[in-house]
Amino acid sequence: MAARHQFENSNEIGVFAALTNAYCLAAVGGSENFYSVFEAELSNEIPVIKASLAGTRLVGRLSVGNKHGLLLPTSATDQEVMHIRNSLPDEVIVQRTEERLSALGNCVACNDHVALVHPDIDQETEEIIADVLGVEVFRQSVAGNVLVGSFCKFSNRGGMVHPQASVQEVDELSSLLQVPLVAGTINRGSDVIGAGLLVNDWIAFCGLDTTSTEIQVIESIYQLHGADSSGAVRDIRASLLDTLV
C-alpha cells in the first residue's frame, strides 16, 4: 500500500524520515502524528525510531541506509549516534563518514544490493558505502542531475526516477539496478522524488499532495500489491510523452 503523509505543513516527508526493510527513522520535535502514523503501520515489522542528526530534524537528507547498515554525517553527535545504534537491530551497522557532501540522503540512492552515488563523492566514502551497506556502488547522474538521492528512489522491487529521464536512460538504469523503473513524479508533479517518497519492499509513504494517479504508479512500480509493474511503466511513459508533445 501507499499512504499519504505530511510533516507539519511539508509534503517532503523524505527530508524528515528514512525507511528501510529493517528500520524507520522519524524526526523528533514534529507533531506526534508524524511519528504515530509510521508506528501504526510499521511497528509490528520493524522498529520506528525518533531521532535527530546534527541537532536538526533532517534525518532523511543527512543519512542513507538499508537493511545492512546506516551511514551518518560526522556532524551527528555522539549522543545521537548512540541513541540510534541502541534502537536498531544488532545486525545493522551504524557508522559516521567524513564526506564533504554531508547531505548523504541527497547524494546516495540505494536498496539492499546496489547504490547510485554522486559522481564527485570521495573514494573513501564510496568504499565505506560498499562495505557498511553491503552494496555494489555506481557513480551516476539521473536526467543530468548529480543529486541521485533526490531525483530517484528504488527498493529491491522497483523504482522511480526523474520525469525527464529518457526512455533509454530509464532502461539502462533498470538494467544496472536489476529492478523495473519508471520516470515519474510525486506530490502533484514534483520531480524531487527522494524528498517526497519513503518506500521499502512492502509499503510506501508519500506527501499529502500526491495524486491518485501518482499513487497508482507508485503501488504498481514498487509492486506493493504484488502487481506486475510493466503496465504502469507503459502507462506513465505514454502520459509523459503526451505531456511533452
UniProtKB/Swiss-Prot annotation:
CDD domains in the cross-refs: IF6
A Gene Ontology term for the protein's cellular component: cytoplasm
A GO molecular function held by the record: translation initiation factor activity
Entry keyword set: Cytoplasm, Initiation factor, Nucleus, Protein biosynthesis, Ribosome biogenesis
Gene3D superfamilies given in the database record: L-arginine/glycine Amidinotransferase, Chain A
Keyword Cytoplasm carried by entry: yes
Record bears the keyword Secreted: no
GO annotation (BP), single: cytosolic ribosome assembly
UniProt-annotated location(s): Cytoplasm; Nucleus, Nucleolus
Domain of life: Eukaryota
Matches recorded under PANTHER family: TRANSLATION INITIATION FACTOR 6
Family (UniProt): Belongs to the eIF-6 family.
Protein's name according to its UniProt entry: Eukaryotic translation initiation factor 6
Gene coding for it: EIF6
